């Protein structure tokens, strides 16, 4: 569960290392974001010579949460930390590689590109 001020690691090769959620998109009173939800983030830590710079604002999709996601069969998929993938204004991934596993819940029409780039889909 990601909320405003939550810090997430970045699971792509855009050059950002850590981002902070500044808004959960999808409704004026929406408080939490889970896996597959779009959030507005600001870059808090970036590598030198990366595609993104510290202080820039982007859309991002949450790909891993420590809270996890409950499946229809009753199983629960949890991760060690929270991670996101940065998106452009057309909601396409900015990076060309994804690091670490992602869940099957991302296999919607919007994020098939992320699923195809990921090394492992749980």
Swiss-Prot record:
It comes from the Bacteria. The keyword Ribosomal protein applies. The keyword rRNA-binding applies. GO terms for biological process: translation. Signal peptide: none annotated. GO terms for cellular component: cytosolic large ribosomal subunit. One of its GO terms (molecular function) is large ribosomal subunit rRNA binding. Keywords: Ribonucleoprotein, Ribosomal protein, RNA-binding, rRNA-binding. CDD domains: Ribosomal_uL14. SUPFAM superfamilies: Ribosomal protein L14. Binds to 23S rRNA. Forms part of two intersubunit bridges in the 70S ribosome. Part of the 50S ribosomal subunit. Forms a cluster with proteins L3 and L19. In the 70S ribosome, L14 and L19 interact and together make contacts with the 16S rRNA in bridges B5 and B8. Belongs to the universal ribosomal protein uL14 family. This is Large ribosomal subunit protein uL14. It comes from Burkholderia vietnamiensis (strain G4 / LMG 22486). The gene is rplN.
């Amino acid at each position: 569960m990601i909320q405003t001020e939550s810090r997430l690691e970045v699971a792509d090769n855009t050059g950002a290392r850590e981002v902070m959620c500044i808004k959960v998109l999808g409704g004026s009173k929406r408080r939490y974001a889970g896996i597959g939800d779009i959030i507005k983030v600001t870059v808090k830590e970036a590598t030198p010579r990366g595609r993104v710079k510290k202080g820039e604002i982007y859309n991002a999709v949450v790909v891993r949460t420590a809270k996890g996601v409950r499946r229809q069969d009753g199983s629960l998929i949890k991760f060690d930390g929270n991670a996101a993938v940065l998106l452009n204004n057309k909601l396409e991934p900015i990076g060309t590689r994804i690091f670490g596993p992602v869940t099957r819940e991302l296999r919607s029409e919007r994020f098939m590109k992320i699923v195809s780039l990921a090394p492992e889909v749980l």
